[in-house]
Curated annotation (Swiss-Prot):
The keyword Cell inner membrane does not apply. It is found in: Cytoplasm. Pathway: Carbohydrate metabolism; tricarboxylic acid cycle; (S)-malate from fumarate: step 1/1. The lineage of its organism: Bacteria, Bacillati, Cyanobacteriota, Cyanophyceae, Synechococcales. This is Fumarate hydratase class II. Its EC number is 4.2.1.2. It comes from Synechocystis sp. (strain ATCC 27184 / PCC 6803 / Kazusa). PROSITE patterns: FUMARATE_LYASES. Involved in the TCA cycle. Catalyzes the stereospecific interconversion of fumarate to L-malate.
Length: 466
């Protein structure tokens, strides 16, 4: 009969672990003592850990600290994790030690046991690969976890959020160009204002997302600084003098991103301003997306009793009781994502402020919330673009009706009859239920021909020289 469990040991003693699991005693202890919630460490973070463990093995070998055969086993096991294998062997919750020590050891143990399996050894024997002595060589949880945080953050921004945000920006720009010739009434304070084109309105959305993309680039330099090499408190104890610089170069080589060794490891371990700054950028992007989504659902409200200027794609039934009802569901999903991102940023900001002396011990909750925001925004932008923006259509007759009946067209008369007289025209038209033109003529302020020459909505969308 095959044993269902094996014995794993750590400095506190021995524990039984399921025979088919690659983790060891420290991971098992974490499962026992931190059964809190259902949030586990993100796969992106585990992959980042595997990258840094591979880079550390290569660097330690190059510096003469790790034998080539051991380095090769670690590299092979790490490569499998980088490729997406063994993710079910990383079960630990976010809610653990604030340095992420249990997750660092989870990675060390899985890589060590997988390396042992590759060479035909006995799982749990720590021979020929020891999780601490070999996989964790020249490292501490205190510098590996923040390093993995930055690797995961940069990779997520570059491969997920930037492409998704750029695609949404480009689709909005296509609509801006398509709608350039459609003049509509503007609105401020949710009230009628002077005209602009629908293309101009959409160009504002494009500019907001351009600003978001620019802000992402502003936050990347801080995220490209790595804590690895600081070891326990930032001094680099038990690492080679060249380790920090060389391992950062190796990580840059492996990822294709320009990572460097953080110039001050004490700050890199005890503070997380770079992630807090980047989270602030995500919050700013969420603010832009909230505005865009709200505008589109307001302009698409109706179909008969709302603004109805835009026809939003009808993707699914909107009500379980009202037949034929269709709702702006993509806008609603987007706005919920935005408020979640804002909440995540509040958590990150507070957690980043909680460093004490040489270490911040809120690391897992910081990266959990950051990657959550990043993925939500990436997915929401893709969904919003595909299922709403691409299929947007304009109800031009509705747009024209609002434009033609707006009292705020009277603003064009200011240079000709003065602000006070123009206000009188608007109030008279509203009170008597007549047109601006009729009110102005009845008040004796101008002729019909003058009104037609001066009040031309299409000429009110840009500055005009006197």
């Amino acid at each position: 009969m095959v044993n269902s469990h094996r014995l794993e040991t750590d400095s506190m003693g021995s524990l039984e672990v399921q025979a088919d699991r690659l983790w060891g005693a420290q991971t098992q202890r974490s499962l026992m003592f931190f059964d809190i919630g259902s949030d586990v460490m993100p796969p992106d973070l585990i992959r980042a850990f595997a990258i840094l463990k591979k880079a550390a093995a290569i660097t330690n070998q190059d510096l003469g600290k790790l034998p080539a055969d051991k380095a090769e086993l670690i590299i092979t096991a790490a490569d499998e994790i980088i490729a997406g294998q063994w993710l079910d062997h990383f079960p630990l919750r976010i809610w653990q030690t604030g340095s992420g020590t249990q997750t660092n050891m989870n990675v060390n143990e899985v890589i060590a046991n997988r390396a042992i399996a590759i060479c035909g050894g006995e799982l749990g024997s720590k021979n020929p690969i020891h999780p601490n002595d070999h996989v964790n060589m020249s490292q501490s949880s205190n510098d590996t976890f923040p390093t993995a945080m930055h690797i995961a953050a940069v990779a997520g921004l570059q491969t997920k959020l930037i492409p998704s945000l750029q695609a949404l920006r480009d689709s909005l720009n296509e609509k801006a160009e398509c709608f350039a010739g459609i003049t509509k009434i503007g609105r401020t304070h949710l009230m009628d204002a002077v005209p602009l084109t629908l293309g101009q309105e959409f160009s504002g959305y494009v500019a907001q997302l351009d600003q978001g993309l620019t802000q992402i680039n502003y936050c990347l330099p801080g995220l490209l600084e790595l804590a690895l090499g600081g070891t326990a408190v930032g001094t680099g104890l038990n690492s080679h003098p060249q380790f920090a610089k060389k391992v950062a170069e190796e990580i840059a080589q492996l990822t294709g991103y320009t990572f460097i060794s953080a110039p001050n490891k004490f700050a890199a371990l005890a503070g997380h301003e770079a992630i807090a700054f980047a989270s602030g950028v995500l919050k700013s992007i969420a603010a832009s997306l909230m505005k865009i989504a709200n505008d589109l659902r307001w302009m698409g409200s109706g179909p008969r009793c709302g603004l109805g200027e835009l026809a939003l794609p009808a993707n699914e039934p909107g009500s379980s009781i009202m037949p034929g009802k269709v709702n702006p569901t993509q806008c609603e999903a987007m706005t919920m994502v935005c408020v979640q991102v804002m909440g995540n940023d509040a958590t990150i900001g507070f957690a980043a402020s909680q460093g004490n002396f040489e270490l911040n011990v809120f690391k897992p909750v910081i990266i959990h919330n950051f990657l959550h925001s990043l993925h939500l925004l990436s997915d929401a932008c893709a969904s919003f673009r595909q299922h709403l923006v691409v299929g947007l259509q304009v109800n031009e007759s509705k747009v024209k009706d609002f434009l033609d009946t707006s009292l705020m067209l009277v603003t064009a008369l200011n240079p000709h009859i003065g602000y006070d007289n123009a206000a009188l025209v608007a109030k008279t038209a509203f009170a008597q239920g007549i047109t601006l033109k009729q009110a102005a003529v009845d008040l004796g302020l101008l002729t019909p021909a003058q009104f037609d020459a001066w009040v031309v909505p299409e000429q009110m969308i840009a500055p005009i020289a006197d």
